[in-house]
Amino acid sequence: MSKSIWVAIGSVFGLLFILFGCAEVIQVGTTVGQGMGQISKEDKEKIDRLALQTEKAIRPMNEQEEYYVGRAVAATILGQYRLYRNEKLTRYLNEVGQALALSSSRPFTYGGYHFAVLDADEVNALACPGGIIFISRGMLKKAQNEEEVAAILAHEIAHVSHKDGLGAIQSARWAEVVTALGTEAARKLSGADLAKLVSLFEGSVNDVAKTLLVNGYSREQESAADLSALSYMNRIGYDPNALADYLEKLAREQRAGANKGFFGTHPGMQDRLSNAKSLIAEKKWTPAGHPERNRRFQQFFPFS
C-alpha cells in the first residue's frame, strides 16, 4: 500500500476514533475499505488490531481494577492507623451506610461498600476507590445524632460514586499499566517487566493514598460530594439539614484557626456550608424528627 493511501486512511480512521472512541467504528471503516478494494485483508487486520490496542490503552479503569486499587489503598491507610475494635458500632455504621449507598447514584460496586472506624482522635474520613470507607473516632465524636452520622457517610459515599479517588491516578501511569496488562506479552513477563508493572500499580495506589492523606480533594470535588450527599439523605428520609449542621461545626473550628490534618486537606469549609444551605433552601427540605433513630443512636453509639 502506498504511503499516501496509508496517511489518508489513518487520518480518516483517526478522526473516527477521536469522535467516537470505539474500535468497532474503525472496524466498520476497514470493512468498507476492504470491500471497495482500497485496502487488503492483511492491512485491514493490522488497522483493526491497532485500533483495539489503542482503545484498551486509553480506556478508564474497570470496576474490578478499581476494587483492587481500593483494597491496596485501604491497606496503605491501615499501615498508618489502627482499626477501632467495636463490633456493635461497626455493624451500626454498616447498616446506616448500606442504606445510604442504595440511595446513591452508584448503589453497587464490584466489592460492595464497607465501613470501618479508625482508632484516631483526629477528625478524618477516607473513601477508597471501590467502596471501602474509613471514619475516625474523632470525626464520629462530633456527631450528635444519627442524622449527622448519615451525613458523614453520605459524603464519603458520594466520593466513591463520583470516582474522585481514581481521578488522583496519573493518566500516563495508568495507560502504562493497561498497555502492559492488555498485551500477549503480559502472560510471559520477565522478572524486570513484572517489577515494572508492580511499580506502576504501586504508583497508582500511592497517587490515591497521597490525595486522601496529604493533598485532599479539590474544593469543587468536596462541594459536589456535599450536594450529592444531601440528595442521598433526602431519598431515604434522613434530614439533609444535618449535613449543614455538621459542616457548621467544622467551619466554626476552621474560623477559629484550625488548619492542620483534616482542615489542611479540606479548606473552604465555609463555602461548602453556604453551598449546602443554598441547595437545602432551594429544595425546601425541612427537618423531620425520627425518635427511633435517636434511640438507635443512643443504643449503638459509644461516644454520645
Residue positions per predicted region:
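Bacterial N-terminal signal peptides that target proteins for export
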Residues: 1-10
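Bacterial N-terminal signal peptides
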Residues: 10-19
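A Zn2+-metalloprotease active-site environment signal
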Residues: 2, 22-304
